[in-house]
Amino acid sequence: MGSRSSTRIPVPPMLIIRIVLTLSCIRLTSSLDGRPLAAAGIVVTGDKAVNIYTSSQTGSIIVKLLPNMPKDKEACAKAPLEAYNRTLTTLLTPLGDSIRRKQESVTTSGGRRQRRFIGAIIGSVALGVATAAQITAASALIQANQNAANILRLKESIAATNEAVHEVTDGLSQIAVAVGKMQQFVNDQFNNTAQELDCIKITQQVGVELNLYLTELTTVFGPQITSPALTQLTIQALYNLAGGNMDYLLTKLGVGNNQLSSLIGSGLITGNPILYDSQTQILGIQVTLPSVGNLNNMRATYLETLSVSTTKGFASALVPKVVTQVGSVIEELDTSYCIGTDLDLYCTRIVTFPMSPGIYSCLSGNTSACMYSKTEGALTTPYMALKGSVIANCKMTTCRCADPPGIISQNYGEAVSLIDRHSCNVLSLDGITLRLSGEFDATYQKNISILDSQVIVTGNLDISTELGNVNNSISNALNKLEESNSKLDKVNVRLTSTSALITYIVLTVISLVFGVLSLVLACYLMYKQKAQQKTLLWLGNNTLDQMRATTKI
């Protein structure tokens, strides 16, 4: 599909700004038009906005696991709270041990261990084996340990508060939010209500809620409880720990409501445990989320191909899976550096490949420039749903219409059939029943035929056949070459030597000289002969005149 020279764009913030400013100056045109391509078996399945991101923002969420009960209800909830506290300690102690072992690899006091750790990184760089990720991880680990130490200094005040969520800023180098899902429950059920509850009911409610939260903790930290390795926590796990209070931290870190749902679906928001204190039952988690640069004029268009009918058999179009369009420029997009959601594409770098003029012309609507590869596989897709309608190859599969009853036939030469609610309300394909609600308006091209010249060979079997034909042609050429060699072998090489050639040239020149001299001599003799003839004729005429004069006398 053309040359594979790539354009790579790194993601420093200044470069992101430059890209945004540059692309904002380009006139935005409409997205890739799939209407002329659908009948040729090329279906535009959707567009996504392209964004560049780098994981540069961090914040801390301090989960308060043990709630504070109102003074008048402490006695009622004492038993379930004590049991919950013991279970928490047993459950999260392995997690705390793993965090402690990780922190022992580097200290924040500038001591010997830190120097040894940083020296190991520098040594690795000198040996050429360290990566940017390793250095970034080391820096993040130092920062996490500093935040954990600062949080521990404030643990008593955090544990004593009755607020379900509040910002912690004293001595912290980054935004930190203390949340308490269980404290929120206690506040809603007991602190902020005038309803009087008996002690038995309080015990039951607190016990049930604590058990449910323990189940969530087990689900979130299950792998880390059974394994000493610390793994990242997903955004879903963070929401399980913090409840709806997680939005407060994300808002503080600058995540807008319009981005929140998309970022949650991308999985780019993660958390790493950095602290567990069994005395106050405080859990510290460092949250990492991306810094996103929106490329407003750039979109990714996804393409799918159907098996179409040609005079050479079934074939599929040779087009990229994903293309990107900025203004009038269309290039193939490499999505291996990207994470996709329903509406967005988040990429660490933008890598595009230029397309050949033929593919560019094809995607621009000139279906006669599209190239196809023969596909004879049984699993080749013969149909596809598009906006409530169906594009199907009714020569490859039976298109049975249930309402109104009938078989949809595909005309000879047509690549695919475009079926909408005007031609069939209920369609059955390979046992799958579809109720059609969309329509293909007049802007969709129909009755497109694929020429033989547009079908090329790419399959292994077809390539073997074509190679056989090429081998036959080569064999015929070799036979002709052998005949030519045999004729050349009959030529006396000595007659074609350099000395002989010089002799031939000299003799030829001499022959030409003699020929010219002979021609000159012949011309001279002819001229002399004609002169003699004129002299004789004159003498004869003169003698005749004298005789006539004598006779008259």
From Swiss-Prot:
Its main location: virion. The chain crosses the membrane at residues 501-521. The record marks 116-117 as: Cleavage. InterPro entries: Fusion_F0_Paramyxovir (IPR000776). It is found in: Virion membrane; Host cell membrane. The inactive precursor F0 is glycosylated and proteolytically cleaved into F1 and F2 to be functionally active. The cleavage is mediated by cellular proteases during the transport and maturation of the polypeptide. It is a single-pass type I membrane protein; Single-pass membrane protein. Residues 522-553 are cytoplasmic. Residues 1-31 form the signal peptide. Keywords: Cleavage on pair of basic residues, Coiled coil, Disulfide bond, Fusion of virus membrane with host cell membrane, Fusion of virus membrane with host membrane, Glycoprotein, Host cell membrane, Host membrane, Lipoprotein, Membrane, Palmitate, Signal, Transmembrane, Transmembrane helix, Viral envelope protein, Viral penetration into host cytoplasm, Virion, Virus entry into host cell. A lipid is attached at residue 523 (S-palmitoyl cysteine). Gene3D superfamilies: 1.10.287.2480, 6.10.10.110, Head and neck region of the ectodomain of NDV fusion glycoprotein (2.60.40.1690), Newcastle disease virus like domain (2.40.490.10). Residues 32-500 are extracellular. Residues 142-170, 466-491 form a coiled coil. GO terms for cellular component: host cell plasma membrane; membrane; viral envelope; virion membrane. SUPFAM superfamilies: Head and neck region of the ectodomain of NDV fusion glycoprotein, Virus ectodomain. One of its GO terms (biological process) is symbiont entry into host cell. Disulfide bonds join 76-199, 338-347, 362-370, 394-399, 401-424. Residues 117-141 are annotated as: Fusion peptide. Class I viral fusion protein. Under the current model, the protein has at least 3 conformational states: pre-fusion native state, pre-hairpin intermediate state, and post-fusion hairpin state. During viral and plasma cell membrane fusion, the heptad repeat (HR) regions assume a trimer-of-hairpins structure, positioning the fusion peptide in close proximity to the C-terminal region of the ectodomain. The formation of this structure appears to drive apposition and subsequent fusion of viral and plasma cell membranes. Belongs to the paramyxoviruses fusion glycoprotein family. Homotrimer of disulfide-linked F1-F2. This is Fusion glycoprotein F0. It comes from Newcastle disease virus (strain Her/33). The gene is F.
